[in-house]
Amino acid sequence: MKKSYILLFLCFCFVSQAQNINLENKVNKKSRVILQSGTYSLPSISEITMKSLNNTERNQEKFIRVISGPSPLSPESWQRLNKAGIENNGYLPINSYLITLSNLNSKTIIALKKEGVTGMSVLMPEMKLSKQLANNNVPDYIWVGNKWELYIEGLPSIDWNRLQNFFKNLEIDLLGPQFEGVRILISPEKVMDLAKHPMITYIQQKEAPAIPENKIGIKNHRSNALRVPYAGGRNYDGDGIVVGHGDDGDIQPHIDFSGRVLANKSGPSNGAHGDHVAGTIMGAGNLDPDGEGQAPGSKLVYYDYPDNLNDIDTDYGLYGIRVTASSYSNGCNAGYTSFTRRVDLDAIQHPSLTHVFSAGNNGNSNCNYGAGSGWGNITGGHKQGKNVIATANVTGSDIIAGSSSRGPAHDGRIKPDIAALGTNVFSCLAPNDYRSITGTSMACPGIAGVLAQLYDAYRQNNNGADPEGGLMRALLTNNADDLGNPGPDFKYGYGRVNGLRAAKAIEMNWFIKDTIAQNETDTIDIPVPSGAEELRIMVHWTDPQATVNAGRALVNDINATLKLNASSWLPWVLNPTPNSTALNSNAVRAVDSLNNSEQFTLGQPNNGDYKLIINGSSIPSGPQGYWVTWTIINDEVELTYPIGGEVLPPLTTIPLRWDAPNGTGNFSLEFSSNGGNSFTQFATAPSSSRQSTFQTPNGVGDSLVFRISRGSATDLTDAPIGLVGYPANLQLNWACPDSFNVSWNSVSNASGYVVYMLGQEYMDAVDTTTNNSYTFYNINPSNTIWWSVAALTPGGKVGKRAVAVEKTPGLQGCLLTNDVIISSILSPSNNIPDCQNTGNLPVSILIENGG
């Protein structure tokens, strides 16, 4: 019933569109506007008369129009138009605007013509519809009984109370405010009557309901290389960075979160999804070191999704949130919704903020992009924003997961933005456990955690100052490891995150900020030395939020060209044509008028001063700030795990990871057990590989070194690596009122042990011992205490800590030399008459020394 009814309604819509105005008969080719509902050619402004007012408009205080011209209007033009009573309510592609006029008369028309406006139209009812409503793609979730739940917007000054009679006549139920508009319930057959009201500017289906969408991840993302285990190295663990995490209800007790959840603003728990995601972001590995997250120094504010987004205006300042993480869907290929506009606006109002989303788990779905199953199925909505990060899911071997959602965004922009490990991610499960889970839900927190580390890196290298979110997005994407097709693509985005390369760009100050206005040109010099193997450059800008009616989300279009002497290059551009061949094709060099990021890459670039020419091609909302960041990759190889200083268990298979530019030679992998005096080759890897495995030798020591080489390029671990086992069979022997005793199996050839107890936030080392037992003193027997132990190498390096053990409250097996016990109760007896007054009844007991 409902489906056939919708078809009937939409047929009426399209007939209505044709009857309202025959746009193609009044074509002004310079006056074209691209909206969600379609592309419209506007009538010439010279044809506009007072007769064009419809009856419902004649008594309005303001009039809504769409105008267009051959180029964007300048700020000076808008100043003059404002004086004439004409307000800009938002940019529309191409060179068009949604405006309100205080008066519609000959003076108004003359003022618009003077500024170059050539086309003008009433905002017709069909122009106000979202793409889904206009294309008869109405999701089931908007039905509430026999009505649709919709979101509507009106004039900026609209008083919704003044529309009560209008709503009553259409039997519309007003549900309440949301974003810049209100939520309503309306019968489907009355939607076009609603759209005809002159004060209504936009109508969309309600936002889609939210659906939830590390051991290896830390190495793959190069997160480990940002917080090395040897003295004097990088220590970017996210210290002081606050992440706003929205998920599935109350985060449950887990010692990996101890002391670092600043606020828990969620309701009752609805599952383990949030616990797992939180652990990937900031888990300390207190229970199990293998469960450590990307940024164990960061802190968390936890919410019910989407309150981490809804509350950011307050909590950006209150808690200092700089990164958010949301692993929830928001409709499949939902387009540029009111929620999308909201998160784009957040990046403008809170310049140091970065929203991170999962790309979605609908990789095999058909979400009506037009290319069939497998393309255009990003699950949002908000994750299709221009100023946010959407994360794809790759396996431990850097292969895109089949379930990971593909781009493009609804208007052809590059999505996802980046990829991270989301397959078999090992992270927290309440209470005090772990589990491996797969999905872009698990990839999103990997990016949020690495971003927390990079924010920390920026602060440490810039006197504690915060970076802008636009810079962090550019650093993250420009320094990713390219996977899949060469250059960006609609599966991996710009590639799998490489936190180390991004941190180096921060340390080298390989970035610059500037602003540009309409038709301005800037030139930025980038010197490239001899011997470079790869040059990467990215231009990125935090683009103004789009008008929700717009068919293309980009507002300000910056175009860049790279030059060296007589040679020039354009940025990489993808083909968004809705067929699988085009969408899966390699990027080509071309002018980009869709994205607010433009990337240039050159292999084996000639040395010299490259000139990046930045042009303000179309800046209707300017001047526009932008970032340029670049990375120069030399002919080097670099081991990223093990990086040096680690202590590994013997006879254990470990991953090896390294970075290197593209090349043709194989990699040679070697190890030394004598501090580098001699090496033994254990593997070769093809030129395309950046990972391998190794089984650590048997025994204990302090002198394990790895070496990797390709041709003349070689790298060693930065510090010797230790070898020692970790204690097993941790036992509580006894617990008394002020102490408890523990023991463990001895570790072969260990020089001693470090004993740990859970402190306020982390497992703190409390003592060392050469025994395989230890007594903790000055302990409150009523407290729960977590403890663990690690072995020491002969050189005193601390090995892997054993999985922590919980000592529960109470006494156990306590033998005391002086122990007072109550052996019996002498009075009162156990036979007390009901009528006896017990108020002053004497009590007598027999006490004995039970020691």
Where are the predicted features?
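Autoinhibitory N-terminal propeptides
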Residues: 18-236, 240-243
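Substrate-binding/access-modulating region of protease and related hydrolase catalytic domains
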Residues: 157-162, 189, 238-239, 284-289, ...
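Subtilisin-like serine protease catalytic core
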Residues: 161, 226-309, 319-322, 333-336, ...
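Catalytic-core environment of secreted peptidases
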Residues: 246-259, 393-445
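Hydrolase catalytic cores
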Residues: 280, 419-486, 612
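C-terminal subdomain of the subtilisin-like protease fold in secreted/lumenal serine endopeptidases
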Residues: 291, 302, 456-532, 550, ...
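Pro/Thr/Ser/Gly-rich low-complexity, intrinsically disordered linker/stalk tracts
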Residues: 722-748, 781, 796-813
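Beta-strand-rich modules
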Residues: 776-796
